[in-house]
Amino acid sequence: ICFSSDQVYSGSPEAGPYTEDRTAPGNLYAAQKLEMEQRVLDVLPESVMLRAEWMYDLSAPKPNYLLNVLRAETALSFSPRQYRGVTYVKEVAQNMERVMALPGGAYNFGSETKQSMYEITQQLVRLLGRQTPVTPGPDRHNLWMDCGKAARQGVVFRDVLEGLTQCLADYDLLPQRREN
């Protein structure tokens, strides 16, 4: 099992969501990830390549999407035209046993969404009961993956907003839960 990246789609001229057979690396990192996948699969065809998205948890030592939103003291800026998944690390760990049973190949791996990062962030700020402004940011490339291939094999994640909500609940950070 190898972790790859959603970046293998970073050069795609299409809007997405992207399936595993439509790679288009747009930078050196992405090209190297795709090359790694191909080299490993050439030697061990039964290997599983997980094209992972941004991941988050609140106990992470480095900043991540959710921590950045929670710590924001000024306006947050996200593109209304950028679609991509962000995935709760706990769900990654919960899915690893099922991942070990996957047939060899590449799999898009993580939470799906039909909302832009701008829309997700607006909803998350509202859910947190915060007044932090969310402003439209510059366009960014979509890294919007179709994770259906893995889901058909039983590797299933909550959608992005449900995963964020679950993480906040796990850490008792939902305002309505703290008030009760």
Residue ranges and their predicted role:
Residues 8-50:
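Catalytic helix-loop patch of NAD(P)-dependent Rossmann-fold dehydrogenases
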Residues 1-6, 50-52:
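SDR active-site strand-loop-helix element
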Residues 95-147, 175-179:
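Mid/C-terminal beta-alpha module of Rossmann-like enzyme folds, strongest
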Residues 90-98, 165:
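Amphipathic alpha-helical segments that line or abut small-molecule/effector binding pockets
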Residues 38-85, 91:
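NAD(P)-dependent short-chain dehydrogenase/reductase
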Residues 10-14, 59-60, 88, 118-120:
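Short glycine-/acidic-enriched loop or helix-start segments at secondary-structure transitions
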Residues 160-180:
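Amphipathic terminal alpha-helices
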Residues 84-87, 115, 145, 155-158:
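Residue-level signal for the nucleotide or nucleotide-sugar donor/cofactor binding architecture
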